[in-house]
């Protein structure tokens, strides 16, 4: 790292020194967010929101390709509506924000500020669904959510955040299960192929599942500090909410039946995962598919040739802008070196440099953010080379993250061994569990680790990590400390 670069990023604490502070330094220094006047809330700044827009674009396309439509439901939920489902309310009660006044008048009924929308969707579906011909109902909404968190960190846990939440209704249990699993696959595909983050997928334990759900499926990712992060969930709600909100339909056999439901969602928390999986001591590294700018152009402009270089840069920009997401940085108030460091810190996948000597040789200089590799490319080969690089960077970033996950996945056969691994290495730890919630809680009490995911095809037959009981039905699950 050059001296100038060291000075430029001196406000970023090294990961090895203080990982939490590193994370906060990166999001502030790269202008992803700023702290809002309201405790626990953040302002997502333009660069941070541009990343969310690219993520939203890739996910929204997949959601629509699987037959879903977008809609928008109210932010406010009447207390009586939320109270209809006791378990659901109990799960969210400590985090619900309430509105009790409208202007100067006390409201006749308190309104909850949306913590999630099962109740609102349930109420509307009870009116909309009458016959089997009305099914399935496949609706998604992009919205904000409020959960009054006590301990907050930007993107990872905030009192208000952005997300998408899908809510569907089906004729049969099999259809609902298929839907919940399909959307889990959608999330896995998006997070791995667009965000270059490998995930483990499977079931949540009964203790960790969504309040009111029959089953909760999830994808879990491993951050570079060895802690897990829940990246997305998909819930088979069974008929639980249908019975609470009286969502029934007349089936083909002329019998009135309850629908089967699902809900599923991911949030801006994924940006936190993006930062922690790929980032380094110099800042962000953003995979090309979700990068606001896949390529930044920095003209090298000595005074005498300034106009020539700027003219040539603009000409090249016009050639590239329809094929790639390109940023031409022709600001006069900063030196090329300053710009190099800024865009490197902001994680732009490729930097393109062009100066007088490059113009003479009919070439440009390309520098990769992920590997720091520098190359000279002829102008007539540039588009092909950029296409090749973008694909290679995307693939290499995923492979690097896969290697990290593999290298930091361990196996433990006793609670002591589990604790030692967590203290020395962290990571995902495979261990057998008997299915007893008391054992799950003992592991958490002793090690602060929770069951992150029960793989769909989990190994069976070992001895429980907590109680030692051996049974052919015991499953090998993943434990980790988590965000």
Swiss-Prot record:
Its EC number is 6.1.1.15. The keyword Cytoplasm applies. GO terms for molecular function: ATP binding; catalytic activity, acting on a protein; proline-tRNA ligase activity; transferase activity. InterPro entries: aa-tRNA-synt_IIb, aa-tRNA-synth_II, aa-tRNA-synth_II/BPL/LPL, Anticodon-bd, Anticodon-bd_dom_sf, Pro-tRNA-ligase_IIa, Pro-tRNA-ligase_IIa_arc-type, Pro-tRNA_ligase_II_C. It is found in: Cytoplasm. GO terms for biological process: prolyl-tRNA aminoacylation. Transmembrane segments: none annotated. It catalyses: tRNA(Pro) + L-proline + ATP = L-prolyl-tRNA(Pro) + AMP + diphosphate. Consists of three domains: the N-terminal catalytic domain, the anticodon-binding domain and the C-terminal extension. HAMAP family: Pro_tRNA_synth_type3 (MF_01571). This is Proline--tRNA ligase. It comes from Natranaerobius thermophilus (strain ATCC BAA-1301 / DSM 18059 / JW/NM-WN-LF). The lineage of its organism: Bacteria, Bacillati, Bacillota, Clostridia, Natranaerobiales.
């Amino acid at each position: 790292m050059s001296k100038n670069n060291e000075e430029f990023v001196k406000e970023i604490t090294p990961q090895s020194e203080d990982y939490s502070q590193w994370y906060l330094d990166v999001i502030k220094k790269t202008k992803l967010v700023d702290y809002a006047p309201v405790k626990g809330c953040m302002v997502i700044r333009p660069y941070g929101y541009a990343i969310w827009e690219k993520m939203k674009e890739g996910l929204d396309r997949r959601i629509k390709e699987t037959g879903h439509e977008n809609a928008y439901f109210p932010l406010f939920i009447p207390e009586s509506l939320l109270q209809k489902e006791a378990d659901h309310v109990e799960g969210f009660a400590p985090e619900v924000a309430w509105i009790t006044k409208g202007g100067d008048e006390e409201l006749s009924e308190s309104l909850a500020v949306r913590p999630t929308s099962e109740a609102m969707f349930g109420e509307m579906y009870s009116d909309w669904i009458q016959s089997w011909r009305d099914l399935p109902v496949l609706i998604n909404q992009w919205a904000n959510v409020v959960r009054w968190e006590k301990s907050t960190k930007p993107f990872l846990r905030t009192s208000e955040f952005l997300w998408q939440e899908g809510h569907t209704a089906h004729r049969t249990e099999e259809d609902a299960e298929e839907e919940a699993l399909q959307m889990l696959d959608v999330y896995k595909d998006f997070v791995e192929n667009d965000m270059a983050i490998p995930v483990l997928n499977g079931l949540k334990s009964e203790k960790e599942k969504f309040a009111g759900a029959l089953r909760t499926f999830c994808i879990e990712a491993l951050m570079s500090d060895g802690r897990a992060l829940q990246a997305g969930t998909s819930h088979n709600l069974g008929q639980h909410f249908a019975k609470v909100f009286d969502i029934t339909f007349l089936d083909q056999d002329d019998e009135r039946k309850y629908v089967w439901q699902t809900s599923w969602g991911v949030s801006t928390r994924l940006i936190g995962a993006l930062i922690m999986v790929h980032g380094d001591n110099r800042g962000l590294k953003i995979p090309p598919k979700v990068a606001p700018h896949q390529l930044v152009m920095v003209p090298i402009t000595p005074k005498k040739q300034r106009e020539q270089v700027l003219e040539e840069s603009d000409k090249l920009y016009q050639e590239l802008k329809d094929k790639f997401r390109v940023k031409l940085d022709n600001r006069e108030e900063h030196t090329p070196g300053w710009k190099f460091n800024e865009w490197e810190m902001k994680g732009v996948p490729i930097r393109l440099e062009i100066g007088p000597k490059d113009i003479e040789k009919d070439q440009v200089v390309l520098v990769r953010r992920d590997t720091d590799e520098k190359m000279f490319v002829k102008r007539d080969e540039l588009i092909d080379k950029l296409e090749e690089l973008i694909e290679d960077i995307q693939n290499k970033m995923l492979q690097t993250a896969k290697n990290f996950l593999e290298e930091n996945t361990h196996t433990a056969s006793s609670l002591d061994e589990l604790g030692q691994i967590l203290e020395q290495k962290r990571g995902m730890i495979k261990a057998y569990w008997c299915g007893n919630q008391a054992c799950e809680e003992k592991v958490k009490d002793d090690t602060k680790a929770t069951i992150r995911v029960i793989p769909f095809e989990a190994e069976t037959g070992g001895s429980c990590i907590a109680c030692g009981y051996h049974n052919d039905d015991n499953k090998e699950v993943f434990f980790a400390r988590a965000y």
